């Protein structure tokens, strides 16, 4: 069986007058993430991990922030397209293990809906997606509530293996 591991990371600044999207869902908060797309750091980290595992470069290569077509795009579209690229290359998802680092808002209540949403977009089982939330104990840019970051590790395998 041919299996591969990928790692992804993303970070965006928190700013006023933007919606907060994480894991494909809108979360009520006074600040949102700044970015060319909807700035969903969790989805972006997952996309990077998937592309890296398949040795297909990164999210910026496939969906450049210099392209107008991706301005304010829903990151679920990027994830769906990443899964299409992965499957076209002959891979399927084994599992995802992801962590989101944010001081606020508290994310644990939102994790079940994030998992459900991501599983639907990716056409995988919810049990194949693990999402954890943490803080940085008020340290660094995350602790000062200046931004949110996400880390994702994925396992992929050749289809039919």
Swiss-Prot record:
The keyword Metal-binding applies. Keywords: Isoprene biosynthesis, Lyase, Metal-binding. A divalent metal cation binds at residues 10, 12, 44. GO terms for biological process: isopentenyl diphosphate biosynthetic process, methylerythritol 4-phosphate pathway; terpenoid biosynthetic process. It is an enzyme of class 4 (lyase). Its cofactor is a divalent metal cation. The record marks 36, 135 as: Transition state stabilizer. Its EC number is 4.6.1.12. 4-CDP-2-C-methyl-D-erythritol 2-phosphate binds at residues 10-12, 36-37, 58-60, 134-137, 141, 144. Pathway: Isoprenoid biosynthesis; isopentenyl diphosphate biosynthesis via DXP pathway; isopentenyl diphosphate from 1-deoxy-D-xylulose 5-phosphate: step 4/6. It comes from the Bacteria. It catalyses: 4-CDP-2-C-methyl-D-erythritol 2-phosphate = 2-C-methyl-D-erythritol 2,4-cyclic diphosphate + CMP. Binds 1 divalent metal cation per subunit. GO terms for molecular function: 2-C-methyl-D-erythritol 2,4-cyclodiphosphate synthase activity; metal ion binding. Homotrimer. Belongs to the IspF family. Involved in the biosynthesis of isopentenyl diphosphate (IPP) and dimethylallyl diphosphate (DMAPP), two major building blocks of isoprenoid compounds. Catalyzes the conversion of 4-diphosphocytidyl-2-C-methyl-D-erythritol 2-phosphate (CDP-ME2P) to 2-C-methyl-D-erythritol 2,4-cyclodiphosphate (ME-CPP) with a corresponding release of cytidine 5-monophosphate (CMP). This is 2-C-methyl-D-erythritol 2,4-cyclodiphosphate synthase. It comes from Parabacteroides distasonis (strain ATCC 8503 / DSM 20701 / CIP 104284 / JCM 5825 / NCTC 11152). The gene is ispF.
